[in-house]
Amino acid sequence: MLLIHKASAGSGKTYNLVFEYLKILLGKKTESGYILDEHPNDNHKKILAITFTNKAAQEMKKRIVKELDLIARNSKNSDHSESLLKAFGTQPNKLQDSAKKALTDVLFDYSNFNVSTIDSFFQTVMRNLARELG
């Protein structure tokens, strides 16, 4: 799935991208939408989020980890908990458990937490295709 957000500065792109990332990380796509994945093992390895600047990439990573932590602790300060509960049609304790598992996976495998810049992404592609590109 490819998801593109185009908008001007200050319009909430990062907020929306963090929500979409969490929905993909914690959910499973079905014909009718998303349902909660109660075993989100290594889902972070299957997601690539790309932005323009290193600052934006670091901010996105920070917000994703913060939100996972808030949801895992069932904090009322989460920006996305209610929206995720509604999107998945699930109970808070189930979302909390999935967030705990996903947070542990992300933190223990941070090098595969793929939020990067466009430049970094293409550098990786070119490095991996160097032989074929000549």
Question: Where are the regions a protein language model picked out?
Answer:
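P-loop NTPase Walker
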Residues: M1-E132
